[in-house]
């Protein structure tokens, strides 16, 4: 009986290898020399490539990688904190630093016409509403300290003076009066500031003065603007008799509300004072 001879053709060998791969078996590796001649078995140890160890997915990262990640995190945190500290706003400036800051940002400090250092020399008393200005001035002049002179500023007279002198606000006032439009916010305060600035440049303006602002301010916006641009107001005087008898007759409901808001605004900071014929001295 003839002995079975195993086929050795390349096609047959590839088919066998494919079958082994499907079956999960690794086909035998045959080491071949550069000229296609099979090498002896003892040479396989020198020419065969050792199998690499592949880390399984369930194996965790090595400790050195964890250490590197920790150090990198601390380094990044340190970098971020130093950058934030560099950009932290300054709470104090020297005069030169503040001037440089103003030039860079375009901001300007708001300068009052009369700063707090001169509050003892010039005392401003606001009278939001007075039915009869001349009568109210006579009453209040007796209550003010005698050691200071008294100056009275009335917005109505300021408007008449501005129109007569053809000042810088005269054309605006003419248009507003011609069309019976309300005065824009801040205009009365601008006229007040202009009048006070002129007064300070006179001889009388060099002496201690109590300044009565009659029928002013009649809105909280004007009050705030005055204290920002001109000076601090010492007291808001509430003429009790005028408020009780004439306020609603002289002003519209909206204006009454605004005047009461002014009184409430100064009352919250303890600067509102009610005055009647029985009061002898203003605080």
UniProtKB/Swiss-Prot annotation:
- State where the transit peptide lies: 1-47
Query: What InterPro entries does this protein map onto?
Result: P-loop_NTPase (IPR027417)
Transmembrane stretches, start-end: 63-82
Task: Tell me the compartments it is located in.
Answer: Mitochondrion membrane
Q: Which GO terms describe its cellular component?
A: mitochondrial membrane
Question: Which interval of the chain is the signal sequence?
Answer: none
Query: Primary place of residence?
Result: mitochondrion
How this chain sits in the membrane, per its record, is:
Single-pass membrane protein
Q: Which UniProt keywords apply?
A: Membrane, Mitochondrion, Transit peptide, Transmembrane, Transmembrane helix
Q: Which family does it belong to?
A: Belongs to the AIM36 family.
Q: What is this protein called?
A: Altered inheritance of mitochondria protein 36, mitochondrial
Which organism is this entry from? Clavispora lusitaniae (strain ATCC 42720) (Yeast)
UniProt lineage: Eukaryota, Fungi, Dikarya, Ascomycota, Saccharomycotina
Q: Which gene encodes it?
A: AIM36
């Amino acid at each position: 009986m003839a002995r079975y001879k195993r086929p050795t053709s390349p096609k047959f060998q590839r088919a066998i290898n494919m079958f082994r791969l499907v079956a999960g078996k690794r086909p035998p590796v045959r080491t071949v020399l550069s000229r296609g001649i099979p090498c002896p078995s003892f040479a396989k140890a020198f020419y065969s490539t050792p199998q690499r160890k592949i880390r399984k997915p369930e194996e965790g990262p090595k400790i050195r990688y964890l250490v590197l990640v920790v150090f990198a995190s601390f380094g990044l945190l340190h970098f971020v904190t130093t950058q934030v500290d560099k950009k932290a706003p300054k709470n104090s400036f020297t005069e030169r630093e503040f001037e440089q800051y103003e030039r860079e940002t375009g901001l300007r400090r708001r300068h009052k016409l009369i700063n707090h250092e001169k509050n003892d020399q010039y005392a401003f008393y606001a009278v939001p509403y007075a039915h009869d200005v001349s009568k109210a001035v006579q009453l209040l002049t007796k209550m003010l300290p005698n050691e200071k002179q008294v100056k009275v500023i009335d917005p109505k007279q300021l408007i008449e003076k501005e129109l007569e002198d053809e000042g810088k606000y005269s054309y605006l006032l003419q248009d507003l009066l011609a069309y019976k439009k309300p005065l824009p916010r801040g205009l009365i305060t601008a006229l007040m500031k202009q009048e006070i600035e002129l007064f300070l440049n006179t001889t009388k303006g060099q002496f201690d003065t109590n300044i009565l602002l009659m029928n002013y301010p009649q809105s909280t916006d004007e009050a705030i603007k005055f204290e920002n641009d001109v000076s601090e107001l010492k007291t808001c005087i509430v003429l009790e008799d005028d408020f009780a008898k004439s306020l609603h007759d002289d002003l519209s409901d909206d204006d009454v509300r605004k005047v009461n808001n002014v009184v409430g605004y100064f009352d919250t900071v303890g600067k509102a004072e009610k005055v009647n014929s029985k009061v002898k001295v203003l605080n």
